[in-house]
Amino acid sequence: MSIGFQNKYNKIINDKEYMKCVEDVFYSDAVKKMDEFIQHGSTTTLEHCINVSYHSYKIAKFLHLDHKSAARAGLLHDLFLYDWHLQPKGDPLFQKHGFTHPQKALENANKYFTLNDKEKDIIEKHMWPLTLRKVPKYKESFLISFVDKYTSTSETVVPVAKRAANYAMLFVMMFASVFR
């Protein structure tokens, strides 16, 4: 992981209790590979998963839930290891990334790591309610599902809103200069 990455996530990396929960997966080659793929906007899949993992860990800890499973599964929930933007056009709806990637992430997570039942449930069901029949079994599964939606939205909408605000300000300045 690059120096820039380490600087960006310094607070998280220095959280010893969090790192103890994820130490066996955080620096693994499989998890590092997620940095090669864009998830939302300019955010890589690794950055997205770290954000989901850390926020879920903090909330789970506050709520006295299984924060270790939340942290680990949050980090692995999108371990699908492909560029989902390159999906072939014309695939039937059930083949779309949003519906299929949790299973691929779970397959990869099982391949590289030892998971408990709760972590498996979290990874497999994190796209609920999109995946209607995959209803989360644990509170931690619901938590990661909600944190994932929040994080995805902030990674997608906030940068667009900032750009829109910048363009709006530019327009106002140009308009104001006409009437000087």
Task: List the predicted regions and their residue ranges.
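Metal-dependent phosphohydrolase cores
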Residues: 1-180
